[in-house]
Amino acid sequence: MKIYNKSYSLTQFESFLSCFIPYRTIFVDIETTGLSSKKNNIYCIGLAFFQNDQILIRQLFAQKQQEEKEILSEFLDFLSKNCNSIYTFNGKTFDLPFLEKRCALHGFSFSATDYPGKDLLQDFRPLKNLLQLPHLRQKDLEQFLGIGREDLYDGGKLISVYMKYEETQDPELEHLLRLHNHEDMLGMLRLLPIYQYNILFQGEFKIQSMHVITEKDHLGTERNSLEIHLSLSDGLPKNITGVNEQIRFLFHGKEGIVSLPVCEDTLHYYLPDYKNYYYLTEEHTIIHKSIAQFVDSQFCQKATPDNCYLPKKGMFLAGNKKSDFFRFQQDRKDKTYYMDLSDLLDVDQKILSADITPALQEELQLLIAERLKKFKPML
């Protein structure tokens, strides 16, 4: 068995990493001779951890498959002295169950549940559509951030390389094997800024200004949208942009522009206490029951849930659910609720900052966050 250590200055990584990562966190990645934890062995365990103002990458490398027990023993001893939580990439599905099984076969006790942490792959899955990535392999995410690699192999292709190394002990083959694991460890650390995109799903941004714009689509039809300028609580590692029928967005650094479709229509606000109203059949409107006694009964009938509404013509923004702002509908069974923008717009189709109340801020933050969560790029 060989043990390799390489240190990096914390300044080589994003400055927030040491604050973002819980105390005594270890990043773990394993290399194996196959996918079966019953039949195959672990030949390398990579560990990355913070030590003072440095990041240290340690590799426990088995020169022979028979040395698996040694590297597992060293791994468990290290965890017992230095670890409270474990971070991995796809570790909950592969690395950690594999380690548990191999430890058990050698008579060691190891349970991943004793080291609560994060699986970066699972955490990043909800971001796939937002980042518009076809796959979420570690190398795909690294390429998205512009992270290069010297390593050209994947774990599966290195199995035959390890078998040849085991026979020859060729140092060049060992370098290839260790390089892949080492760059996986570095890659995990460098992918941590992707967590910053979660601020978009959590609505951690502030609306700075809003105005309605009118544009022509590819068919020449005029369409209205509400353009919202945002400031983000934290900067994003890479600019992103996207468009579909529900939202258009551009985020760069600590700023963002979001456009939401707006419709011009006559919509209805349905009154819940319909029993207190009467419907005028000629005027197609409602009056309170206290006034109905003065109207000819042949032109007046008790209101129903379907016709007890106040019509409003204007510009409307579709929302996710009914609220104090989103309360208009196309009809009573319509599950989409709309907010009337007309009274908020000035002569330049802008919504003044003074009119963006804390309650409206929160409502629109939730709406934008929900649209971003559900975003799927147009094909």
Predicted region positions:
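DEDD superfamily 3′-5′ metal-dependent exonuclease/proofreading module
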Residues: M1-V28, T33-N40, F50-L379
